[in-house]
């Protein structure tokens, strides 16, 4: 009997599949792309490194091509000119997020990253008010303090001179900073086992969350979809953030009681935290509790992982290109101001030195290009029929941004696989290595770009300038450091060992 029921479900699913996709596939039929298999489409061609397969399709079919992932008709864009036409010039059509079943089951797509319409507008506006350039400058002391704490840890490795991995140090560094912005929490410990454990959960979640979940594309497989480890790690993250939120609320209540005991006015001023603003919107009935927790998860993940990954990839690149490391050190040294006691500053602030250390900005851009944290953008969906570059794209089509291939385009970035920071020197057409800031899409394009990009730039600039000025990073082996990361929602850097020598 179960066999007959399974066959009946399969037949019904196939009928629904062909009915729903007939219109989309007809409209999208002129877009080039690979041959699709029945039911699976091109899903089985995507392995553990989807960006590599997307690159192969791009090389064969061009900047716009069509694939089908299970029952979902998909169009892939490559290159900033196409991104601009879609996500800037036609932003209302391309802005909505495609909401897969797995994401909807996880948080109802009520988080900052996954939501659409009024929910997304409310959450984005709220987060942006807490990470403006002025607020980042006011909060810069948090980054300075964390840089000082990190240097204390790294100084110990200078003394023993042994090779060691930097990855966990930078994850914890970024974790401490984002906790300050999210909750106003100060945590200076790099030996806290619970923090290391949650970092491990973040890494695992971002790895498994980046790989296709089959039931998102073939609904008949829904009974098996929770076997994916995405559903193991996301609840752990939500529980962790829930505890942090409860700690914040308890601390606020304690502060309120203390003020009452001391007959002080409880004016409930804005404490400058993101969670404070989220809770205010929640109590005003503008967002749900799910939005509060899941948006905290979004900010927590991005704050811990994206900036630390870019920093690690930068140090790998600077060790493998030692001439770039020395060039950067010399520029920092030559432009550094003396403190009142005549010594060099320990922490090099973004607000003070951003314009006087231009080579660091070039290095950061080249890392954003060559080691983009996002290789394949989170999916969008078209809200109506549209035409891009002569191709008709139907309403309901999933849209994917091919960031990896965009940044490796030889036409835009000659010698694209080489680390050449000088390619971003703004010299117009005379720069033989291409460049131009607008061709970088690592922070996204249009209304869905990264809300934390200013904070990320500030944090990465400050820690890199500080560390390169203070230490020389050395490869302990004769072979170049491995710079091939692992695919996920965020591109994860490999584990390498470094030797560091103190310069100051």
Swiss-Prot record:
PROSITE patterns listed in its UniProt record: CYTOCHROME_P450 (PS00086)
Keywords: Heme, Iron, Membrane, Metal-binding, Monooxygenase, Oxidoreductase, Transmembrane, Transmembrane helix
Predominant subcellular localization, coarse grouping: membrane
InterPro entries the UniProt entry points to: Cyt_P450, Cyt_P450_CS, Cyt_P450_E_grp-I, Cyt_P450_sf
Pfam annotation, one family: p450
Location relative to the cell: Membrane
CDD domains: CYP1_2-like (cd20617)
Membrane-spanning intervals of the chain: 1-21
Annotated family: Belongs to the cytochrome P450 family.
A GO MF term: heme binding
UniProt name for this protein: Probable cytochrome P450 513E1
Organism, scientific name: Dictyostelium discoideum (Social amoeba)
E.C. designation(s): 1.14.-.-
Cofactor dependency: heme
Binding site for heme: 450
Membrane topology, record value: Single-pass membrane protein
GO cellular component: membrane
Bridged cysteine pairs (disulfide): none
């Amino acid at each position: 009997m179960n066999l007959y029921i399974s066959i009946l479900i399969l037949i019904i699913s196939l009928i629904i599949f062909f009915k729903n996709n007939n219109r989309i596939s007809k409209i999208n039929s002129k877009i080039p792309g690979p041959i699709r298999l029945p039911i699976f489409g091109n899903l089985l061609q995507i392995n553990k490194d989807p960006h590599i397969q997307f690159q192969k399709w791009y090389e064969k079919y061009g900047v716009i091509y069509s694939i089908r992932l299970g029952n979902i008709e998909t169009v892939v864009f490559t290159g900033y000119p196409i991104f601009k036409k879609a996500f800037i010039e036609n932003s209302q059509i391309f802005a909505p997020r495609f909401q897969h079943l797995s994401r909807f089951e996880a948080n109802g797509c009520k988080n900052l990253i996954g939501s659409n319409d009024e929910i997304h507008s409310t959450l984005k506006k709220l987060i942006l008010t807490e990470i403006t350039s002025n607020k980042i400058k006011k909060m810069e002391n948090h980054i300075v303090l964390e840089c000082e704490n990190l240097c204390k840890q790294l100084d110990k490795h200078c003394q023993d001179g042994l090779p060691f991995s930097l990855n966990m140090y930078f994850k914890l560094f970024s974790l401490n900073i984002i906790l300050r912005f999210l909750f106003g929490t100060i945590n200076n410990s790099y030996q806290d086992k619970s923090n290391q454990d949650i970092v491990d959960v973040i890494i695992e979640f971002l790895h498994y969350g980046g790989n296709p979940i089959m039931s998102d594309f073939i609904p008949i497989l829904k009974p098996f979809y929770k076997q994916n480890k995405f559903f193991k790690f996301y609840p752990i993250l939500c529980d962790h953030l829930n505890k942090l939120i409860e700690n914040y609320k308890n601390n606020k209540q304690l502060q309120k009681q203390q003020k009452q005991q001391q007959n002080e006015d409880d004016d409930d001023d804005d404490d400058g935290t993101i969670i404070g603003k989220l809770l205010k919107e929640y109590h005003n009935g503008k967002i749900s509790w799910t939005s509060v927790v899941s948006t905290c998860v979004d900010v927590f993940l991005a704050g811990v992982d994206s900036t630390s990954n870019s920093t690690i990839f930068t140090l790998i690149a600077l060790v493998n290109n030692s001439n770039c490391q020395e060039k950067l050190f010399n520029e920092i040294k030559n432009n550094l101001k003396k403190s009142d006691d005549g010594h060099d500053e320990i922490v090099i602030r973004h607000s003070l030195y951003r314009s006087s250390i231009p080579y660091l900005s070039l290095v950061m851009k080249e890392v954003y290009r060559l080691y983009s944290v996002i290789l394949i953008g989170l999916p969008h969906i078209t809200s109506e029929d549209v035409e891009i570059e002569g191709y008709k794209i139907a309403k309901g089509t999933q849209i994917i941004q091919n960031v990896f291939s965009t940044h490796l385009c030889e036409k835009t970035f000659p010698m694209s696989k080489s680390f050449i920071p000088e390619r971003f020197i703004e010299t117009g057409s005379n720069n033989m290595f291409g460049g131009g800031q607008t061709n970088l899409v690592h922070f996204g394009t249009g209304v869905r770009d990264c809300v934390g990009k200013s904070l990320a730039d500030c944090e990465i600039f400050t820690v890199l300038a500080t560390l390169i000025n203070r230490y020389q990073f050395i490869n302990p082996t004769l072979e170049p450091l491995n710079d091939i990361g692992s695919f996920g929602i965020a591109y994860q850097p490999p584990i390498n060992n470094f030797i560091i020598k103190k310069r100051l």
